Amino acid sequence: MSISFNNIPSALRVPLTYIEFDNTKAVSGPPTALHKVLMLGTKLATGSAKAGEAVRVSAYAQAKTLFGRGSQLAEMVKTFKAHNSTLDLWVLPLDEAPSGAKATGSVQITGTATQAGTFSLMIAGNNYKTAVTSGDTADVVAGKLQKLIAADQDVPVVATVAGNTITLTCRFKGETGNEIDLRCNYYSGEAFPEGLKATITDMKNGAVNPDMSVAITGLGAEWWNYIINPFTDTESLNLLRADLVKRWGPLKQIDGICFMAKRGTHAEVTTFAEQRNDYLFSLLATHKAPQPAYLWASAYAAVVAGSLAIDPARPVQTLVMDLLPPSMSDRWDLPERNTLLYSGVSTYTVNAGSQPQVEAAITMYRKNAFGDNDESYLYVETIATLSYLRYAIRSRITQKFPRHKLANDGTRIGPGQAIVTPKIIRNELLALFTELEFAGLVEDFEQFNQTLFVERDSNNPCRVNVLSNENLVNQFRIYAHAIQFIL
């Protein structure tokens, strides 16, 4: 018998017809990958979710129940869903560190209103406005604002008032509370009512982030294509990096890229980034933006991951994040952004509608093992394309040759036999390359064909070894043009 049946035995005498199905040739074309996003963050004690266990989240209302109203995670989910409602979002909640401290800040109002007006106070991008009448004292205005803030259970701070001073305390412990921005009069046209002023003490003294080792345990053996991480302390990043590198490796092949954001001055961000060299981390610098960096990380991941899931090689530049940008005086110019990009930091610009948009999404990888500049893993599109190529190759081999015997090239094989040879595998890889070429992910078939090497292992007759040189399609990023004009 030359045909390799899967279920029909050869020792049959009972009549008559036995037909089986074999799906190894059913699927053609590059495979469709199902992308999963995992969000890390802090839950409150009021949330019903169990810390350390990932849970699928489909809506903001669900997140508030799972992680607590005003929690870091609830607001991160809200931001993510506002930017991407289709990707499969999972959340891995973490308890705050028992030894941690909550960030605090304050707003001190002084003076007495001499004219009616509106007092505007923004907290973490949420604008609280109260009417002021002539003669209102600082204590009266502070009391009005405190009531507004206290009534909002979704703001990440708790507000108390004593006289003319509003004290704000983060709802959760950890360093991320220090990212909560406090400011007055953000929007054009807003101003203090005549006779009133405010002195703001920025949020500070938040300390000790949740235990990242709990998060890593919670990752399990699932394939998380994209991870959103709000914790940027060195210890947490080192633990996460080690796990992501293992996942990227050939034995696990469940790789993922981690998206983060960092608040700080240009010097602070570049100094931070240049201490790292991580090809599976992508960090966006926010500068003095009204919303916390953890919300920027959520929006950044939502728009970039959404694009990469559709086409991993297409550049993500100009993708819009519906966030509040820094004031015009706090926006970085081209030389500053160029420096950020050479420091391993992704950048954004602000469009005509005052919306931040991705300018360049890069990884934090800058140097090779010898400390020399290395652009091999610079762009997130490269990481995403490599991940998909490996998935496509693995899917093709496991789909076409799941239970095949292995023979040398030139072996006489009967029709229908489940036998594969190095040449058959080589031809299958060439066919897959042409499909990926039409999909706009690779180029230069002739070079690939000439350099593709497939052999049967000389020490293990059950193993095939392959060496290939895929030429990845790049992104159109720079257009340079010199005009030599004639008069």
Swiss-Prot record:
Pfam families: Phage_sheath_1, Phage_sheath_1C, Phage_sheath_domII
UniProt xrefs under InterPro entries: Phage_sheath-like_beta, Phage_sheath_subtilisin, Tail_sheath, Tail_sheath_C
Family, per entry: Belongs to the myoviridae tail sheath protein family.
Role description: Major component of the tail.
The protein's name: Mu-like prophage FluMu tail sheath protein
Species in which this protein is naturally found: Haemophilus influenzae (strain ATCC 51907 / DSM 11121 / KW20 / Rd)
